[in-house]
């Protein structure tokens, strides 16, 4: 029976989570540019910070790009409305 040291185990976990983060970032970029048709520099917008991770997980190949775009427009409008209401 082989024993795995805790250092080896933590290194394996780090490798797995590192590749998962890379895949997640790749999905976010594909969603941003491919589905939404936005420039990569738009990823820093606070609404997109919430929007991208949520929908990148749901993106499964055959997607209705129009539905995602309409949802983004709705979220941007709500954000703008709340921002203006809060500053009055």
UniProtKB/Swiss-Prot annotation:
InterPro entries in the cross-refs: HV_small_capsid
GO biological process, one term: viral process
Species annotation: Human herpesvirus 6A (strain Uganda-1102)
Keywords for this protein: Capsid protein, Host nucleus, Virion
Keyword Transcription: no
Assembly and interaction partners: Interacts with the major capsid protein/MCP.
Family listed: Belongs to the herpesviridae small capsomere-interacting protein family.
Main localization, broad class: virion
Record localization: Virion; Host nucleus
Transmembrane segments: none
Pfam assignment, any one: HV_small_capsid
Name this polypeptide is given: Small capsomere-interacting protein
Comp. bias regions, Polar residues: 9-19
GO cellular component: host cell nucleus; viral capsid
Function: Participates in the assembly of the infectious particles by decorating the outer surface of the capsid shell and thus forming a layer between the capsid and the tegument. Complexes composed of the major capsid protein and small capsomere-interacting protein/SCP assemble together in the host cytoplasm and are translocated to the nucleus, where they accumulate and participate in capsid assembly.
Gene that this polypeptide is encoded by: SCP
Region (Disordered): 1-30
């Amino acid at each position: 029976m082989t024993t795995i040291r805790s250092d080896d185990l933590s290194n394996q976990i780090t490798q797995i989570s590192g590749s998962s983060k890379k895949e997640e970032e790749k999905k976010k970029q594909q969603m941003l540019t491919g589905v939404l048709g936005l420039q990569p520099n738009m990823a820093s917008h606070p609404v997109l910070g919430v929007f991208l991770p949520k929908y990148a997980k749901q993106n499964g190949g055959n997607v209705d790009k129009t539905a995602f775009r309409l949802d983004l427009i709705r979220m941007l409008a709500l954000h703008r409305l709340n921002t203006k209401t809060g500053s009055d």
